[in-house]
Amino acid sequence: MRIKLELFGASRDFSKKNHLEIEVQDKASIKDLRHEIILYLNENFKGNENFIKIIKSSTFCSENNEIINDNYEITKDQKIGIIPPIGGG
């Protein structure tokens, strides 16, 4: 399945576009999607640890703008948003 991953906040550094297209297996979970994103980052950004930390600490939201957890099952091609943590110093 093809996921259009909408990028927000710090995750916008992952692409020149405002999204990534990620392939996942049928009935993948958000946990599986998170793993595929990390593989993408390892391949395209040489394992940038800051980017990987962003992925590990981000929340995801469905097409209906609902927060979804790592067990959420992806059953079709769809848009999913990634919402990195917001922090300051």
Predicted regions and their residues:
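Ubiquitin-like/PB1-type beta-grasp interaction modules and other compact soluble beta-rich domains
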Residues: 1-88
